Amino acid sequence: MTRILTACKVVKTLKSGFGLANVTSKRQWDFSRPGIRLLSVKAQTAHIVLEDGTKMKGYSFGHPSSVAGEVVFNTGLGGYSEALTDPAYKGQILTMANPIIGNGGAPDTTARDELGLNKYMESDGIKVAGLLVLNYSHDYNHWLATKSLGQWLQEEKVPAIYGVDTRMLTKIIRDKGTMLGKIEFEGQSVDFVDPNKQNLIAEVSTKDVKVFGKGNPTKVVAVDCGIKNNVIRLLVKRGAEVHLVPWNHDFTQMDYDGLLIAGGPGNPALAQPLIQNVKKILESDRKEPLFGISTGNIITGLAAGAKSYKMSMANRGQNQPVLNITNRQAFITAQNHGYALDNTLPAGWKPLFVNVNDQTNEGIMHESKPFFAVQFHPEVSPGPTDTEYLFDSFFSLIKKGKGTTITSVLPKPALVASRVEVSKVLILGSGGLSIGQAGEFDYSGSQAVKAMKEENVKTVLMNPNIASVQTNEVGLKQADAVYFLPITPQFVTEVIKAERPDGLILGMGGQTALNCGVELFKRGVLKEYGVKVLGTSVESIMATEDRQLFSDKLNEINEKIAPSFAVESMEDALKAADTIGYPVMIRSAYALGGLGSGICPNKETLMDLGTKAFAMTNQILVERSVTGWKEIEYEVVRDADDNCVTVCNMENVDAMGVHTGDSVVVAPAQTLSNAEFQMLRRTSINVVRHLGIVGECNIQFALHPTSMEYCIIEVNARLSRSSALASKATGYPLAFIAAKIALGIPLPEIKNVVSGKTSACFEPSLDYMVTKIPRWDLDRFHGTSSRIGSSMKSVGEVMAIGRTFEESFQKALRMCHPSVDGFTPRLPMNKEWPANLDLRKELSEPSSTRIYAIAKALENNMSLDEIVKLTSIDKWFLYKMRDILNMDKTLKGLNSESVTEETLRQAKEIGFSDKQISKCLGLTEAQTRELRLKKNIHPWVKQIDTLAAEYPSVTNYLYVTYNGQEHDIKFDEHGIMVLGCGPYHIGSSVEFDWCAVSSIRTLRQLGKKTVVVNCNPETVSTDFDECDKLYFEELSLERILDIYHQEACNGCIISVGGQIPNNLAVPLYKNGVKIMGTSPLQIDRAEDRSIFSAVLDELKVAQAPWKAVNTLNEALEFANSVGYPCLLRPSYVLSGSAMNVVFSEDEMKRFLEEATRVSQEHPVVLTKFIEGAREVEMDAVGKEGRVISHAISEHVEDAGVHSGDATLMLPTQTISQGAIEKVKDATRKIAKAFAISGPFNVQFLVKGNDVLVIECNLRASRSFPFVSKTLGVDFIDVATKVMIGESVDEKHLPTLEQPIIPSDYVAIKAPMFSWPRLRDADPILRCEMASTGEVACFGEGIHTAFLKAMLSTGFKIPQKGILIGIQQSFRPRFLGVAEQLHNEGFKLFATEATSDWLNANNVPATPVAWPSQEGQNPSLSSIRKLIRDGSIDLVINLPNNNTKFVHDNYVIRRTAVDSGIALLTNFQVTKLFAEAVQKARTVDSKSLFHYRQYSAGKAA
């Protein structure tokens, strides 16, 4: 809501509606806008007053006249123009639950259709007595709009106010029943009026008989009880000549083929003349069909002898589920009625439909005559068109003759399913996290396991992602067996042989699981072992994944897709592009996250992108580019009974051309009309039905911004990133529901777990909105452009919840990175815009920083039309963004003395943080907080209940907003707060979600109440049933303090969520928060690298020579004294941000500048880099300075590779016992010195028996899940008990004195990289972390474990040739490796000098040309050609800084990645690979539990 920023529109509406001189109750507005003079405008206030005494203040945007009526609410997400003109609202003051109204303005209210009916309205004008909304869009945008909503309301003299907590109002009506109310302006007192005592039907009915569709063959008499225009349209469309008669017209003697009664408002029992006329028809011999709609249902029932009653709160909205009693099929319906028939029907009549939620009557039918009626609105407008088929049924009755009933003409359900009988189900996970396939599948897989357990189905989970919650082996919500194995057809087949499941779920493991399942189907494995694919069939999956099949399927139902050709060669791709015309879009089959896709403006780009795409797949789609169109997504659920619901629709703020995973996304869609919304919804359901999807799927549309033209982009027949977002945005647990559906359970029988009362067969209503913003880490990848497009690049995302776009948008921006204050022109991480910035180019070429470029353009007074032209972003979003910057300017003109409570409150309502405000007012954040609280401005806690408060909810799913007037919940539990990890990014991924979930579960097992704060929709920790209270909120000092104090928490755990919460330790502590575990003062000493190094010196714990430096001269002086290379490290960072090995003075200058930018408040530490050392990790739990649990793992790679990118071995393989004892001794000293109570991690360098400390983190590390699962001891469980002061049984813990060292198996943790997505990035490892995920596997020895782990990362073991590229210094060490590879039968290729050296040492090698020298020597083959034709299927490239072929080596590495072949760039990993290939002839399918069982058997 932008109250302070909307004065221009207020002026317009005030001038057009009434004179300013009449305003009595006034509110001062401050307003400034570029190009517009400063205005001082007074906005009129009014109150909504209820008969129970409730009084709420609001601000007028309609006609300034008091009015009385019955206050009702509508939870619909769209179609306010249609709703306002619905005659059923006559005499009622309508409360819209949708928090933002007026986005699309008002259409042409004078336009008429071919029947002479108002084209965009459901009657001849607005019928509501008044309108109440939370937030009104003064600035509107839609291609059909001709004026603002406020202007239209004033023209029709209808009062409307905004600024009302509509959720609070809805709850009052819900709990107390519909009640009388009034909108009162000062000086215009009115009495309460009960419209139900009036015959409202008479007021809205036509006064004359009117005929529509004259000359049509079927005569239908339509009795107007407040009939909607769309009823008439639908009748005429089907060939009716409609005779519209007044409500009291005697139609009993009229000649007709069918009789329809439709409407309307008020108490139907008051329409006695109509009831008597219908009674005559029912009791006569006339058997022409009768169809009653809404009031027509009650009128028909009353005429038949049934009774009606006034409902306590009415059914008004667009998501009411009804069940056809005759065939058990469910439909989503639009409803608007306050009266209903009771369930005792007279003889000869029976119910036809029933409400799934409240079991009220929704329709009746005669048992022998063609009479039927429904309580809902099959003509909708606004709302879903699911039951429009009833008009067809009505006409079928007319055509069939007079002696039949409605059941004979209703369409038969497409499917009648039965429960799928399975006893054991195999669930395929997605493997390690990668760009495009991240933590959302941990969430969805965990939900699927939970659903199976609820239904007493045994589950076998196959997933090598050691860091995921779903791969826990112990717990009530865990699978019965877990296999840490590669998700490949070979290994899945072995698991099927061993476990003999009778069911298989493919939809919870992303593209990995889907592709694997398709291959198993094609190979006949599933048929051979009698495994049923649950949910969507493989044939349907193939129809969505194969681009040609998909196109053919859509053509079968005449659905719109972009003109396209599926091709299998570059030659055909070029021909297709010529036929379609450039620009074209290419898409790969069976690909994830837009991999292998891109926009090709010309032939050269198509050649480049197409060649890379064909390296990954055998088929691509070449299609017309719809860049610049709107991108809209729907999440659709369909059960085996053909019941369909659309759970969520989402709108990409970024237009087509940017992958949805890289787009800013809002839910629900904000700029669609009801016609657009329902058109795409209807299409979604039609497509999903035709494709045979059973479960959940995502469908993406391109919608033309100024017409109704659309095309379908793709369908994902599985849970996806968007599914996880939709689940968290709505509270509807999509994965859980999809898993139940896969067992054949129909939707109406599944409970809505959020409300605890309603069915899962419904479409959620939102009285808030969410904004998703991606998190990129492109700066980490050298050579990668910040430009984004159709291939996804983001590594994570956040979701923010608010009740205005501005609020959720600014929250989301801050959630993405702690350095961001909100929507500002400043770049994240304190970066500066380049001096030669081309702002127009920044806007026209989407990038990871374009949102800040938009802010900069607005700051520079660029016009909105120009920004729209450059970005194709809908102007409505830009209006809102401009409003934020206008508030920023307003605040900058004030100070702590002059800023008013009103202005401060308005800033908070549009998402300004205290920190943001403090920078405008010249205060500190603490001073701003103090000022705000002094003015009694505080946030409100609201629930996400899936129903917009329509039903009471048991949900604990919460968010915080300044747009409200009451809390939804009580604060009487005083739980322990646990801070989650925030957005996934490089260095902080699913492993920290595992830590948080483990801690939460331990607390709950101990009987402690938990309060969780996190903002990542991909996580299990943000699953509302994991904790007692879930706040989907910012991990900022301000918001944590808000929640902590409001909840009166008993303490806060910050050490299980990674670096973001850890960085809050000291600020929270200084603000009085009780930090559980290690003291924040000790955390501060450890995080500050300078202080930590000094402490180690005091403890006489060995470390490499170091120095804290503040200037370049200090750094150069130190480096010259100890010699290069040196390691440069900033403080308080995660995953090696700005950490670099420095080899020269030039590098020192460059890297030091970067390090000081990311860590401005703390000194940078320089350390002598120790070459040739092995890195060792110590993961441990301390208790009051004593180590009570520990695990030591070893890196395969030598030091210099970030620990997050390293391959870990547990137990250690090459470290001497003497060195291990030194590691333990140093750990003891550190634990004692820092009085550690909780989790911590220490990293060591080991060279021979020398042991040096690298760093210590007084929090959980990313290797905690790995060591916990490997050793069978949950380190976080232990740490949590320590932190809250619970006793810990140390007898079975791996203490320093009695370690647990596996003897029968070895665990290998391997990193997952996403190099193919990061176009032009150099795929080589450095100090700064680059991996996006991890996997772990187990084997009897290191070699089998290593090969399993490598295969789990997608590594393909070569079958033909290996290209070797090594620098001269590597040769002596590499010769043995080369001999091993040659002996294993691989053909070796090498550049000329290396080839000569290998041949001279009796290792045959074929010489090849460097890429830059291709063609110079005809006898030397091209590396790129050999790779692309498959002669080379592994590249070993071991460069150093001394080579003169730096660029050539980069080209070779990049070619390997772009061609989808294996690449090794580390000598130690290459050496282990060669050994593994030689020694591990076969790789078994055993997993951790097999080895544990063997160990237990030996022990017994």
Curated annotation (Swiss-Prot):
SMART domains linked: CPSase_L_D3, CPSase_sm_chain, MGS
Gene behind this protein: Cps1
Membrane-protein topology: Peripheral membrane protein
Location of the ATP-grasp domain: 551-743, 1093-1284
UniProt remark on domains: The type-1 glutamine amidotransferase domain is defective.
Consequence of substituting residue 1437 to D: 70-fold increase in the activation constant of NAG
PROSITE patterns, per the entry: ATP_GRASP, CPSASE_1, CPSASE_2, GATASE_TYPE_1, MGS
Subunit structure, interactors included: Can form homooligomers (monomers as predominant form and dimers).
Keyword line: Acetylation, Allosteric enzyme, ATP-binding, Cell membrane, Glycoprotein, Ligase, Membrane, Mitochondrion, Nucleotide-binding, Nucleus, Phosphoprotein, Repeat, Transit peptide, Urea cycle
Catalysed reactions, semicolon-separated: hydrogencarbonate + NH4(+) + 2 ATP = carbamoyl phosphate + 2 ADP + phosphate + 2 H(+)
Reported effect, residue 1410 to K: 60-fold increase in the activation constant of NAG
Region (Anthranilate phosphoribosyltransferase homolog): 39-218
Residue range of the transit peptide in the UniProt record, numbered on this chain: 1-38
Protein name, entry field: Carbamoyl-phosphate synthase [ammonia], mitochondrial
